[in-house]
């Protein structure tokens, strides 16, 4: 922890956070590329909605398995930075291979490989932040690392740039474009970021409110709720990314340019929420932020189903309904890391991120795609409404973990006892 190591200056901590955020931004840029390019890919490869869902789900499956494995390995063995650099180079190569895919099965294979490469990147990044960033800024740092770059690059820049590039040069060249910058960021990380081998913080004493032993940690109620919320949030995210571009073009009859800018509005919203809401949670608490944003998740599917106005009004609906993305780093990283023994943070993060990908990322698009084949493209929006309802029910039971909020509560309690 940086409090014991004076060389981990505030400047280095924010430089570390910015680099990890940029790296994960290109992860989501590559991951989401197929979703935004699907209107171009579908006719050439002859895909139905179930196959579209399968392409999204297969990546989530191997992503989840990698998150489980890397989180555990990073807690017990080896160099976190080395694992991060190798994974980053591998996912860039997989993106390039996606542009060469001649069929559904070939594309399926490249997406499976990409999931293996990408799945461990965020657990590794959050482990580095947990070990090297001051706990007073942990929420916003984890939020920026997970949400800022991924939202800016994966949800805003990706649809605008990739759709424009595919329109001009073809979707295959758009995949080649997606691979290049990730290699540059991986090289910078290799030379700039300091390593935190094994469980560097294993000798640290856990805070008083953190539970002990490994299995007790993973059975801790906050971790269970965070796994459930992670599953629901990833389900909402992946189903929206997978089917909203098709809904906008096939049902609302927007052209490719309008669709790309509307999907880009999600990126702008998530970029802002990644630091505004996580930073706010450092001050007012994690629980209230997660609960309120879960409630606002109703706005996007309901507003889209009822929409009959100009595109800019739908962009406003997207902006409000996407607030839950600001809570994703909290339930997938910050709250779990503050709820378990410091030696088991990697395993807890792997459980949240891996579990969310298997159930939220693998099964959700498959079921939603099959539902859409039988009912129509509005079916995934009904799915989102159900997910929002379940998220609200789970979020209200979270236990507060924000250090500043707990410290204020302890101070108030001491004052009350003296009186």
Q: How would you name each of these model-derived features?
A:
Residues 2-10, 196-227, 415-419:
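Juxtamembrane intracellular "pre-TM" segments in multi-pass secondary transporters
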Residues 46, 78, 100-106, 253, ...:
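Helix-breaking motifs and short loop linkers at transmembrane-helix boundaries and internal kinks
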Residues 34-35, 222-271:
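Extracytoplasmic gate region of multi-pass secondary transporters
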Residues 110-150:
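Cytoplasmic helix-loop-helix junction between adjacent transmembrane helices
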Residues 145, 149-191:
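Helix-loop-helix hairpin linking two adjacent transmembrane segments in secondary transporters
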């Amino acid at each position: 922890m940086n409090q014991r190591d004076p060389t981990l200056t505030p400047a280095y901590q924010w430089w570390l956070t910015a680099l990890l955020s940029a790296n994960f931004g290109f992860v989501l840029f590559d991951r989401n590329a197929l979703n935004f390019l699907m209107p171009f890919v579908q006719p050439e490869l002859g895909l139905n909605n179930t196959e579209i869902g399968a392409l999204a789900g297969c990546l989530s499956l191997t992503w989840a398995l990698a998150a489980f494995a890397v989180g555990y390995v990073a807690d017990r063995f080896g160099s976190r930075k080395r694992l991060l650099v190798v994974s980053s180079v591998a996912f860039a190569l997989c993106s390039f291979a996606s542009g060469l895919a001649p069929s559904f099965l070939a594309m399926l294979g490249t997406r499976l490989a990409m999931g293996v490469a990408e799945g461990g990147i965020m657990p590794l990044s959050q482990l580095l932040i947990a070990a090297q960033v001051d706990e007073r800024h942990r929420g916003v740092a984890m939020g920026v690392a997970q949400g800022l770059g991924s939202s800016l690059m994966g949800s805003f820049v990706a649809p605008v740039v990739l759709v424009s590039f595919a329109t001009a040069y073809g979707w295959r060249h758009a995949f080649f474009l997606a691979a290049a910058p990730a290699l540059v960021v991986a090289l910078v990380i290799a030379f700039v970021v300091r390593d935190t081998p094994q469980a560097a913080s294993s000798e640290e004493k856990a805070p008083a409110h953190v539970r002990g032993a490994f299995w007790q940690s993973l059975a801790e109620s906050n971790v269970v709720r965070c796994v459930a919320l992670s599953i629901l949030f990833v389900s909402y995210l992946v189903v929206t990314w997978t089917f909203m571009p098709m809904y906008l073009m096939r049902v609302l009859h927007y052209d490719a340019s309008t669709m790309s800018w509307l999907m880009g509005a999600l990126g702008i919203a998530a970029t802002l929420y990644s630091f505004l809401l996580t930073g706010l949670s450092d001050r007012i608490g994690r629980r209230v932020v997660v609960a309120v944003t879960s409630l606002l998740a109703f706005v996007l599917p309901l507003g889209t189903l009822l929409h009959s106005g100009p595109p800019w009004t739908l962009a406003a609906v997207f902006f409000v309904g996407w607030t839950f993305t600001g809570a994703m780093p909290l339930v997938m990283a910050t709250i779990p890391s503050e709820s378990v023994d410091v030696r088991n943070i990697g395993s807890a993060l792997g459980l949240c991120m891996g579990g969310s990908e298997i159930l939220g990322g693998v099964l959700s698009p498959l079921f939603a795609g099959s539902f859409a084949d039988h009912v129509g493209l509005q079916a995934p929006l009904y799915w989102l409404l159900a997910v929002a309802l379940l998220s609200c029910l789970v979020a209200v039971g979270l236990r507060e973990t924000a250090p500043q909020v707990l410290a204020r509560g302890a101070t108030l309690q001491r004052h009350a006892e003296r009186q």
